[in-house]
Amino acid sequence: MQGFTAPRFSSSARLAGGCIAAALCAEATAEEAGFIEGARATLQARNYFFSRDYADIKGASTQSRTQEWAQGFILNASSGYTQGTLGVGVDVTGLLGFKLDSSPEHARSGLLPSLDSGKSADEYSRLGAAIKFKVSQTELKVGELMPNLPVLLFSDLRLLPPTYQGAMLESREFAGLTLSAGQFRSTSLRDSSNSQKMYALVNDPINPARLARFTSDRFNYVGADYAFNDNRTSVGVWQAQLEDIYQQRFYSFKHAEPLGSWTLGVNAGYFDAREDGSKVAGDYDNHALFSLFSAKTGGHTFYVGYQQIGGDDGFIQVGANTNPMGNTLPTYEFSAPGERSWQVRHDYNFVALGLPGLTSTLRYVKGRDVETGLGFEGRDRERDLDLAYVVQSGPLAGLGIRVRNVMARSNYRTDIDENRLILSYTIKVF
């Protein structure tokens, strides 16, 4: 292994670093209880093995397997707020990843940065901070952020999560109503030590990376969610813009209805997107509808989902993230132009059988009617099996083990067989 290098400090870390002193000064004029006693910090150790075999390869790539093993550490530290009308605090995020096993012919798994030589980096790291302000039930954060929004979903799918540099405002001044707004200026990808401009990722069967060369340093959003009916029903409206590339609207509806020993639920949404501003990436047209119905009783939860993509293009999002649509899976997205897909899924919590900590997920999604541009209709399908266990007691209490097996098949894209093994353990620092 190469010698360890110091962590990269993002611009937000330098910005918020200067603000930490300001927060402490503000705190000095108030009671120490809020800023210090409200502080929390956790350190998660994450061991990740990722293996993906490619068969019936379609496209320019000739790589038949991706396989890497890595160790990561995720530090999340958060202060409380200073006392008074305006509360001030600081959040700090530290990320560190090490290569345990990799080879040039099996690299590019998303766990580790790829070097020009084709090898994966021995280690990488990031350190960032955000200053936060709070008045009543309104909070503003500026700096290094991990947003989890329907228009920019938090995608912690590999060794380390991605982060964004910018500002987020959230207000809960009125019962049931959450108002959100923000702007991000750059991102640090999940397998990178550096920050960069943001790019759009579109599901295009012919050229999946056709928008990746177009970047923007402005992602703007506003949104409103309203929960009512004892929080069993919620509706949402969001607007997002990756400046000069695309703009997108999102409408959501969620409901849960108790019915005897059952709880029935629905999660539905509609996206509508088009080109934005100077259209540096050209014209764009997409709308997407999804619905996921659930029925829960005892340890069982059953799901049935339907998803439909319309417009001239596939679904679009900021890369490299996922999205909240019901049939989007970590391997296939089922969001190509014209695609219609159906899902059946079963989750089980084994606590119902006296085995607390053990859970399973089995799901199957099938898609058709893909406009491939190759002279035939595209079809794809995927089966995922997840088993997870969290040790409940003893010296290893809290240790999480997750196993995932995936089989994905298509007549217009590369077939995939995938296995993941993830061990995680979170330590409460203070």
UniProtKB/Swiss-Prot annotation:
Probable transporter, possibly involved in the aerobic nicotinate degradation pathway. The gene is nicP. The keyword Transport applies. GO terms for cellular component: membrane. InterPro entries: OM_porin_bac, Porin_dom_sf. Keywords: Aromatic hydrocarbons catabolism, Signal, Transport. Transmembrane segments: none annotated. Residues 1-30 form the signal peptide. This is Porin-like protein NicP. Induction: Repressed by NicR in the absence of 6-hydroxynicotinate (6HNA) inducer. In presence of 6HNA, repression is alleviated. It comes from Pseudomonas putida (strain ATCC 47054 / DSM 6125 / CFBP 8728 / NCIMB 11950 / KT2440). It comes from the Bacteria. Belongs to the outer membrane porin (Opr) (TC 1.B.25) family. Gene3D superfamilies: Porin (2.40.160.10). PANTHER family: CHITOPORIN. One of its GO terms (biological process) is catabolic process. One of its GO terms (molecular function) is porin activity. The keyword Signal applies.
